[in-house]
A protein has these predicted regions:
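Outer-membrane beta-barrel "beta-signal"
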Residues: 354-356, 388-402
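Outer-envelope beta-barrel architecture signal
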Residues: 4, 22-28, 69, 73-77, ...
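Outer membrane beta-barrel
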Residues: 22-36, 51-180, 186-188, 195-205, ...
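Outer-membrane beta-barrel architecture
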Residues: 9, 64-66, 104-106, 160-162, ...
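Detector for outer-membrane/organellar transmembrane beta-barrel domains
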Residues: 193-349
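Sequence/structural signature of outer-membrane beta-barrel proteins
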Residues: 35-41, 86-90, 123, 176-182, ...
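Gram-negative bacterial Sec-dependent N-terminal signal peptides
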Residues: 1-21
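Residues that define the transmembrane beta-barrel architecture of outer-membrane proteins
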Residues: 4, 47-61, 98-101, 153-157, ...
Length: 402
């Protein structure tokens, strides 16, 4: 009741007609953790460990308002506005967008649900079946810097349709308008897929693609992915994921395979040197071509010479008691670079979650990332790449949801 009253006050402050809603609720989550990460690049060949207070590692910190109105005849109007933030600094998330996590309005009924606005696509639902569901942001970087979208990316200017539940199956399709005058395809995004849940079995399959444009309908990590090369309307990202999980008593075993294709990045490369882990600091006067190639973002996921990547994700969630779960997972990512050897990343994660109550939980995670023939994406929250072929991070945190 207190939440509903507070939500009405918030909406009134924005001048909204809160009184028209059948129900309005404020909700959110706050996730803070202490972290230590070793072998972070501090310049040149130097490295150092980092102690930090992180936000949203396992569950993105957020504050949202949602409402539903019964229109009669089995039809309901609904809306959600959700803001992301960093609890360690108080800064807004999603590059400062006010309702960066979600802003939608729509209708639901026997026909399914239609939502319009800024929202995630079905690959977020598919990803939640495996490691992203257990570890959250812990595994987003090894998942091709989340270019496979399994840890949640948003689509601006979008309309999404979700089917009713048919004996455990729910389908979804999303379309993002590029809003480019004279070129409908520029900046356009499209995705579809579905999930199936029946007893101990859970399966998901999703596909998403985005096109280059002055405005990109989709949030895409990696500046090179949909920026430069080709022309407006050219497809710059294609990705799909297949995931499955099965509950064996107290143990949930899961796995997924993701593939990302970046058609435009390869088109921009005319020369590709062999990978050299010391090229970035071998010649500070930039007298060698390798240094120039590194500066342009080669040998990184979504970089100038990265044309595709694929990720295998395997894990187990073992429930020891109603309050305690042990979680573990492994990710193997292989990145294909133009006219040179493939890069590889392997990340191992071990952790535990303990529920103090229905709304409050604690967690501890240790993870190790190893790379070869490419630059490390790093484990640190501020995204400073690891400077070594092996990097370890430790986190202990607290989550409160309301």
């Amino acid at each position: 009741m207190k939440k509903s009253i507070l939500a009405l006050a918030v909406l009134a402050a924005f001048g909204g007609a809160a009184h028209a809603q059948s129900s309005v609720t404020i909700y959110g989550a706050v996730d803070a953790s202490l972290s230590y990460t070793n072998k972070i690049s501090t310049g040149g060949k130097d490295t150092g460990g980092q102690m930090a207070l992180d936000s949203g590692l396992m569950k993105g910190s957020r504050l949202g308002v949602k409402g539903v109105e019964d229109l009669g005849g089995g039809i309901k109007a609904l809306f959600t506005i959700e803001n992301g933030f960093s609890v360690d600094t108080g800064e807004a998330g999603q590059k400062g967008v006010l309702w960066g996590r979600q802003a939608t309005v729509g209708l639901s009924g026997n026909f399914g649900t239609v939502l319009a606005g800024r929202q995630k696509d079905v690959l977020d639902d598919v990803g939640s079946i495996t490691s992203p569901g257990d570890f959250g942001g812990v595994v987003s970087r090894v998942h091709s810097l989340n270019l496979d979208r399994t840890n949640g990316e948003r689509v601006n200017n979008s309309i999404r349709y979700n089917t009713p539940n048919f004996n455990g199956f729910t389908g979804s399709v999303i379309y993002g308008f590029g809003e480019q005058a004279g070129n409908t395809g520029a900046g356009q995004s499209f995705g579809l897929g579905g999930t199936y849940a029946n007893g101990p079995l859970n399966i998901g399959l999703g596909y998403f693609q985005s096109k280059m444009g002055g405005k990109s309908a989709s949030d895409v990590n990696g500046a090179a992915a949909c920026n430069g090369g080709g022309k407006y309307g050219d497809t710059c990202l294609k990705t799909w994921t297949l995931a499955a999980a099965y509950q064996f008593g107290p143990a949930r075993v899961y796995g997924s395979y993701s593939r990302v294709k970046l058609p435009l990045t390869a088109a921009r490369r005319s020369f590709d040197p062999k990978f050299d882990s010391f090229a970035a600091w071998t010649d500070p006067n930039k007298k060698i071509e390798r240094y120039d190639a590194v500066e342009k973002g080669d040998y990184t996921i979504g970089g100038a010479n990265n044309e595709s990547s694929q990720t295998l994700d395997l894990g187990v969630n073992y429930r020891i008691s109603p309050s305690l779960a042990l979680i573990s997972s492994l990710q193997y990512t292989r990145a294909k670079f133009v006219r040179t050897s493939d890069g590889r990343m392997v990340q191992i994660n071990l952790g535990a979650k303990y529920d103090l109550s229905k709304r409050t939980s604690t967690y501890a995670v240790i993870r190790n990332l190893r790379t070869s023939d490419m630059y490390s994406v790093g484990l640190a929250s501020d995204r400073v790449p690891g400077s070594d072929r092996s990097q370890t991070g430790i986190n202990a945190g607290l989550i409160h949801s309301f």
